[in-house]
Swiss-Prot record:
Domain of life assignment: Bacteria
UniProt-recorded name of the protein: ATP synthase subunit delta
Source taxonomy: Bacteria, Bacillati, Mycoplasmatota, Mollicutes, Acholeplasmatales
Tagged with keyword Ion transport: yes
Protein family according to the UniProt entry: Belongs to the ATPase delta chain family.
Cellular compartments annotated: Cell membrane
PANTHER family registered for this protein in UniProt: ATP SYNTHASE DELTA CHAIN
Membrane topology: Peripheral membrane protein
Pfam families: OSCP
Gene from which the chain derives: atpH
Keywords: ATP synthesis, Cell membrane, CF(1), Hydrogen ion transport, Ion transport, Membrane, Transport
Length: 171
């Protein structure tokens, strides 16, 4: 709920300022830094460190513009930096929809060829009219064979694991 409020506010402001692309890049940079240095997030969220020290730390990086810095400092002031992953996921979904891109999570037992990826795009294009489809590929050896696609909570699974589970249920 809280992460939705922050992602909505950032999205509306970025839309108003025509800064969607810029914020996407900066948010990706921030997420990458946060994953590489998880203690940094703990530090930014800590009430023991003054906000102006945190602001100075972020400013000294020199990679965030004023709009994104204000957003980060809002999270810092309210001790909500730890929500960055949830906010980022929601932000990406909103920004991709604005750009008419469907970001589909694709799970397979092994990496898929470009030809197979294009076949899958064609198969699901009817379900996502007017959107360009991009896959975020994940390897999941438990699928054994086949694929599972997830988009905004909806899922299509065509895997050997699912077929075996279905047979087991029917027996």
């Amino acid at each position: 709920m809280t992460s939705t409020i922050y992602s909505d506010a950032l999205f509306k402001l970025a839309l108003k300022e025509d800064a969607i692309e810029s914020i996407i890049e900066q948010f990706e940079t921030f997420v990458s830094l946060a994953r590489d240095y998880p203690d940094w997030i703990v530090l930014l969220d800590s009430p023991m460190i003054r906000n102006r020290v945190k602001n100075k730390m972020l400013t000294e990086l020199g990679i965030f513009d004023a709009l994104f810095m204000n957003f980060l400092m809002l999270l810092v002031r309210h001790h909500q930096v730890r929500l960055y992953e949830d906010i980022y996921e929601q932000w990406i979904a909103k920004s991709r929809l604005n750009q008419k891109i469907a970001y589909v999570q694709l799970y397979s037992a092994k990496p898929l060829s470009k030809k197979r990826l294009n076949q899958l795009k064609e198969e699901i294009q009817d379900y996502l009219p007017g959107l360009e489809i991009e896959f975020n590929q994940h390897i999941d050896p438990t699928l054994i064979e086949g694929v599972k696609m997830t988009y905004q909570g909806r899922s299509i699974e065509r895997s050997l694991k699912k077929a075996l589970d279905d047979m087991r249920t029917n027996i």
